[in-house]
Amino acid sequence: MRKVINFLKKLNNSINYVNKLNNELSINNDYYIPRMLVENRILLKKNTQQKLNVVLIAFEPETWLMFQSIYETFSKSEKINMTVFVIPYAHSTLPEGVYKDDGLREYLDSIDVPYIYGYNEKTNTWLDLFQLRPDYVFYQAPYNGMYPETLKSGYVSRFAQICFIPYATILMKGKIEETVYPIDFFKDSTYLFIENDINKNIITEYFSIKDTLFLEKKIIVTGSTKIENVYTLINDTSLEKNIFTILWLPRWNTREGMCTFFDYYDILLAYVQEHENVRLIFRPHPLTFQNFIHTGEMTLAEVSRVKETFSTQNLILDENPDYVTAFNTANVLVADPTSLIYEFFATQKPIIYTRKIDILNAFGAELEKGCYSVTNAEELKNCLDNLVLKNDRLAKTRSYIIQRYFDKNEKASEQILDILTH
């Protein structure tokens, strides 16, 4: 009798689940049905050996490296039609309705990557991505606020599967997670390709806090497409024997409490002036000057003076889209919290982390063990003095971290291609 009762309970639960699912499908037909049709279309194309259409939506030269190996690997595949879709972008530091062209077309021209420009400047109209009949779409950034309606994830996911790869490896915790892990975009995505298990755990924990743990099943650990490229580009041939080069990467805004640009600007200038064999390369984030002008922390005249100051042999302003060139030239990185700390680790060179608040997540804390953390000008100068003299006590620690979290044979793009074509 008990078995019969248990069976009836299970049957009732199953019926309730089916009824609930049918109800959801009825209520959310506009959400579920288009996505089911997309999935079936892709499956049919795979089974009939038709080429899959892949689109990379891109707008910024500085983070193109995330796409470089995807572009190269996918373009070689006989199963893929590859399109690079270049656009201008919106941002909170720009007036509403204004879209900025960041020069990606010129950069792609310089490296012989063909593209389609998705915006008609004369008519102020956008090319509808649907016209390209994409099967898979990769975004350079997962922020719907940067895109017009015809490129937002909610619309695009009705006719294509969205693939997320990080434009930056997130090393920070707290409020910033609200920005860098956009739930609306992740809900519309089919695949979330993540660098490593520790970052998967961080994102999963965030999903749990946001009551969206169902998104975890979308996560696939593939390695980093950026690290895959960095390893092919780093070398020591650019190092000069008699010059010690500091690469400085301060954060682009002060509202987060992490930026040390104004704290160490004069300190680093003075250090270079006091040491004739020391060079400083200042590499501002693409939004740095735009943001400081927007917030009133700098004027146009002050920005011009900074650029003029960094125009000498030993004070260099680096706005080259290819930041790995600066990696190769530098003897040490001095940086606020930034994903480039993670990428610079691949060079095996020392890193000075300019710590201001407790902001690093679990992965950032692991990397910090191999960094020289400084909290004031005196500590920064002492640390630089030691490194100029080649006193690098954390070299072995960095080697251990590299062995644990980095792979010189990183093939993230090949893994992603295999997942999407099988």
Where are these regions (language model features)?
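Membrane-proximal basic amphipathic "stem/tether" segments
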Residues: M1-T48
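Nucleotide-activated donor-dependent transferases that construct or modify glycoconjugates
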Residues: I33-P61, P142, L247-P250
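Active-site and donor-binding regions of nucleotide-sugar-utilizing enzymes
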Residues: V55-N229
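Conserved catalytic-core segment of nucleotide-activated headgroup transferases in glycan assembly
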Residues: L65-I70, I219, S224-E302, V374, ...
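A donor-sugar binding/catalytic signature common to diverse glycosyltransferases
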Residues: C163-F164, E319-A362
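Nucleotide-activated donor-binding/catalytic signature segment of Leloir-type glycosyltransferases, i.e.
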Residues: G296-E319
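C-terminal amphipathic helix plus adjacent low-complexity
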Residues: A377-E378, N382-H422
